[in-house]
A protein has these predicted regions:
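Selective detector of the "anchor" transmembrane alpha-helix that sits immediately C-terminal
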Residues: 216-218
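Short, flexible, mixed-charge acidic loops at enzyme active sites
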Residues: 49-54, 156-160
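Short helix C-cap/helix-to-loop transition motifs enriched in small/turn-promoting residues
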Residues: 7, 40-44
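Mechanotransmission and gating elements of multispan inner-membrane complexes involved in transport
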Residues: 100-103, 111-214
Length: 218
């Protein structure tokens, strides 16, 4: 995953986190939308640099009662406010998740309020989600936050088909922080990946940049 920080626009990559969905059930047999991720992760890069990244930065607007699980808190979990309320869960309680005979107990470190589907689910550490799936090392997708330049005609042309660009057009496009060029470069360094924009939030600090959320599907 650290390859994401090796692209030409590496300094425009703000944060990223893997996501892995698990179809699990709780102690009552009820289906619980479960997601494995990095909450706050220290990553050593091949360049010798290190970064701190994770869902705590990508979802900084979430309301958290309690705290985010620490990187080394193997059994820590975030529980959505809707699920917690309907099951009488508070910080410090235990949530038991099972998938196809594999069972794990998790401690509720925080209760999240997002205003979306996350409120109905449970978030756990990525290795624990992999253990429930019995698939070590697997990742479903990676969400990437990047600073990008607003699209123009060249960017839109490239987004449709990069191969339609002339040599000079492709050089200009590749060396400009368009969302399509950053997505293209992520696909170059991540084998068998597809990167696409999923959300854009305008930045208003006198700089013509946008903060774009990219979802890279592996």
């Amino acid at each position: 995953l650290g390859n994401i920080k090796t692209i030409f626009w590496t300094y425009n990559i703000l944060d990223f986190a893997p996501l892995l969905s698990v179809s699990a059930t709780d102690a009552s047999g009820e289906h619980v939308p479960t997601t494995g991720t990095w909450f706050g992760h220290h990553l050593e890069l091949a360049t010798g640099e290190s970064i701190e990244t994770g869902l705590d930065k990508l979802r900084g607007w979430w309301g958290i009662e309690g705290s985010w699980p620490a990187d080394d808190d193997e059994d820590g979990a975030l529980v959505g406010a809707t699920y917690a309320a309907s099951h009488g869960l508070t910080v410090g309680d235990t949530v038991t998740l099972t998938r196809e005979g594999i069972t794990r107990d998790f401690t509720v470190r925080g209760i999240l309020t997002s205003g979306d589907d996350a409120d109905r689910g449970v978030f756990i550490q990525l290795p624990q989600a992999q253990a429930l799936l019995n698939r070590e090392g697997v990742v479903g997708s990676v969400e990437v936050s990047a600073l990008t330049t607003p699209d123009n005609d060249l960017a839109r042309k490239a987004a449709k088909n990069p191969n339609s660009l002339s040599v000079s057009e492709k050089e200009t496009w590749y060396c400009t922080a368009y969302v399509s060029s950053i997505a293209f470069q992520i696909e170059e360094v991540m084998t068998d990946s597809v990167a696409r924009p999923v959300r854009q939030v305008a930045q208003s600090e006198g700089v013509i940049l946008e903060k774009t959320q990219l979802l890279m599907v592996l």
